[in-house]
Amino acid sequence: TMDDAINVMQYFVPCPYGRQIEVADGITIKFTDIGHLLGSSSIEVWLREADVEKKLVFSGDIGNFNQPLIKDPSYTREADYVIMESTYGDRYHGKHQDYVTELTDVIQRTFDRGGNVVIPSFAVGRTQELLYYIRQIKAEDRIKNHGDFKVVVDSPLAVEATKIFNMNIDEI
């Protein structure tokens, strides 16, 4: 229930990236910024029993380099066991494209034909990145003959996520 979710928050403890924390006898953890979304991390877990220590790494999505709003990922160099999400593990993403030029071209061509641009997007991460690029396009006055244009985000979750990005600008 919502009450259960709110009540459990009293047990949350913020853990900074990069600091080893002993959470129990023989168990140490460290969070690493994985560069996927704001606040995302992988976790390294060291398990010690007698003279034997094993290192496990748990990770979800791993981010890309040179993203406009997210720091580059930090990688763990070694582990005894790795457990991770791998939705795109079988795909090569290729080189980073010039998204600003591509987006400018789409907006310009659509406006020239009298249309509106509708961009479906994930509420967290992608929407904020698109807003960043659109702001850059507007600041550089890249769209010709159409003046300033209105941008609407029609997703309550995306609006709330954008507020969180704005509140944590120092993490970008």
What are these regions (language model features)?
Residues 1-129, 135-144:
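His/Asp/Glu-rich metal-coordinating catalytic cores
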Residues 125-126, 146-168:
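Short, conserved secondary-structure transition motifs
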Residues 170-172:
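Ligand-binding beta-strand-loop-alpha-helix segment within the catalytic cores
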